[in-house]
């Protein structure tokens, strides 16, 4: 198995390919990316067979911005016989992996693949039984074992392989299944909810998304992101010249400041969260977020960077490098992660967690 398969949003295959090529080189793995426009996936073919396995094991998945999922695979299985599609798949996995903990039969996230999805659901049951019979898959789901992936890109054509449960997306097709809350002011609320799922471990939600925290939402109108904070019983400073949804104001948890998000300063020094989804140039938003973190005005931040039409990966890389550099220059110890979320379009979402205070010698409380 010498291929790494990566899922992405259709239309972002070039960015995904550029990223995996760069990251692989940094891990001394060399190869080339096969890209088909609007296909929703990228195939990175390694020159050395063992490099693909090594990449999916050691290249931190959370460092990849444009990939929704990543697994090691062999060559494309073509023209699977309708009377027996299972045997070639079992043959591909035999000797490559054993005692996996989960099976996912998936398709790319495209309109063309919707019909294939129906087949995948039906096919999963007999395939799971066969893989268990051959000891490739355990008789029960086990979260700490590898995950088997079968990606159908067309009827009778699939990539077959596996990922490691500690270095992949835990979601089917790499997409969190979130339901739009009927009382939310806008669909943008799903961006922040997905960001919480992607960036913050579930067992830390009570600590880092807890009741009674103070948060600031810059560019809040009409309140899609504020809604997520209010739902978690936070007190929110919503900053926007536009109107907020009356339903949010009625909670008593929202203080609406009709002001410019680039000029607003927090009225208290115990703000934990800063969130921002303003339609502005990425460099301008990056600079603003850096200022807040350096001044110690927040401890964690989630914000969106709108992408240009061309050189999107280069623009993202540049802004993240500038952010890291500014934090480092000011002695701020922080984790920075970015992801092109399912609910993002021409934008990426960035999460920053600051560990050290802007005040010298004082460590932030967790």
From Swiss-Prot:
Top enzyme class, one word, equals transferase
Q: List the disulfide bonds.
A: none
Instruction: Name the reaction it catalyses.
Output: cytidine(2498) in 23S rRNA + S-adenosyl-L-methionine = 2'-O-methylcytidine(2498) in 23S rRNA + S-adenosyl-L-homocysteine + H(+)
Q: Which InterPro entries match?
A: RlmM_FDX, RlmM_THUMP-like, RNA_MeTrfase_FtsJ_dom, rRNA_MeTrfase_M, SAM-dependent_MTases_sf
Its cellular-component GO annotations read: cytoplasm
Per UniProt, S-adenosyl-L-methionine binds at 188, 221-224, 240, 260, 277
**Which residues of this protein are catalytic?**
306 (proton acceptor)
Q: Which Pfam families match?
A: FtsJ (PF01728), RlmM_FDX (PF18125), RLMM_N (PF21239)
Q: Which PANTHER family does the entry link to?
A: RIBOSOMAL RNA LARGE SUBUNIT METHYLTRANSFERASE M, RIBOSOMAL RNA METHYLTRANSFERASE FTSJ DOMAIN-CONTAINING PROTEIN
Describe the function of this protein.
Catalyzes the 2'-O-methylation at nucleotide C2498 in 23S rRNA.
Summarize subunit and interaction data from the UniProt record for this chain: Monomer.
- Family the entry assigns: Belongs to the class I-like SAM-binding methyltransferase superfamily. RNA methyltransferase RlmE family. RlmM subfamily.
Cross-referenced HAMAP family, in alphabetical order? Answer: 23SrRNA_methyltr_M
Its name, as the record gives it, is Ribosomal RNA large subunit methyltransferase M
Native species: Pectobacterium carotovorum subsp. carotovorum (strain PC1)
The beginning of the lineage is: Bacteria, Pseudomonadati, Pseudomonadota, Gammaproteobacteria, Enterobacterales
